[in-house]
A protein has these predicted regions:
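Core SAM-dependent methyltransferase catalytic element
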Residues: 189, 198-211
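Helix-to-beta-strand junctions that scaffold the AdoMet/dcAdoMet cofactor pocket
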Residues: 84-85, 145-146, 159-161
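Class I SAM-dependent methyltransferase SAM/SAH-binding core
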Residues: 67-69, 73-125
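A short acidic, Gly/Pro-enriched loop at the edge of an enzyme's catalytic core
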Residues: 124-135
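A short SAM/SAH-binding and catalytic strip from SAM-dependent methyltransferases
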Residues: 134-146
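Class I SAM-dependent transferase core
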Residues: 2-61
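Conserved class I S-adenosyl-L-methionine
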Residues: 166-189
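A short glycine-rich, Lys/Arg-flanked "PGG" loop and its adjoining helix->strand segment in the class I
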Residues: 149-164
């Protein structure tokens, strides 16, 4: 078999694996595998997922209460904690205990543990007071939930009137959902459109909770 055929075969296998993973995820959404959490900080991903650049359009500021839904290994949690300052608070939520622990270690190493409260739970029912959150951030996590509308209903409960929700998705993630589908979910949940940034490869939606 020639080199060209080998390359074509390898490419076909890779594409087939990607298609299979996406179909399986669409049938049965599931969290990002914890054993692969090191890939969340891979330099290739950081080319388009730099925490400062990703969070910039969401309007974080000193004194805010921010909710990191599906915090994973804390890739964005640390930067959230920096931006809310000493008077702010970050609630980091993940359904996988090992992810919560990895994020806790990371935040502690950054010297920001006093600003972050961790919750090992799902997004359908969170141990947070109603009307207590200024901003909820979901980065490649809403698409991992079997019932995204249940999560959005819970987020409406915990968000303050006038609070914001930022949903961001990226094409390399096997659970990727196009922005028009996420917009339909957010509209159905009662949020008001606030803007779209990025491109089909990696986009962010901002919506408001009008109460």
């Amino acid at each position: 078999m020639g080199l060209g055929n080998l390359l074509a075969r390898g490419l076909g296998i890779a594409i087939g694996a990607q298609v299979g993973a996406r179909v399986a995820h669409r049938i049965r959404p599931r969290p990002y595998p914890a054993p692969l959490r090191h890939l969340l900080d891979h330099p290739a991903r950081m080319q388009y997922r730099d925490p400062v650049a990703t969070l910039g359009p969401f309007g974080l500021g000193p004194g805010q209460t921010v909710l990191d839904v599906g915090c994973g290994a804390g890739t964005f949690t640390v930067e959230m904690a920096r931006q809310v300052g000493g008077e702010g608070r970050v609630h980091a939520v993940d359904i996988q205990a090992s992810m919560v622990e990895a994020a806790r270690v990371r935040v502690t190493a950054a010297g920001l543990s006093e600003r972050v409260q961790f919750h090992h739970c799902g997004a359908y029912r969170m141990p947070l007071a109603s009307d207590s959150v200024d901003l909820a951030v979901l980065i490649a996590s809403l698409s991992e939930m079997p019932q995204p509308l249940f999560a959005l209903e819970e987020l409406r409960r915990v968000l303050k009137t006038g609070g914001r929700i930022a949903v961001s998705e990226e094409l390399p993630h096997s659970g990727y959902v196009p922005h028009w589908a996420v917009r339909n979910w957010l509209r159905e949940a009662g949020f008001r459109y606030g803007g779209l940034r990025g491109n089909p490869f990696c986009y962010s939606l901002l919506y408001f909770n009008d109460g």
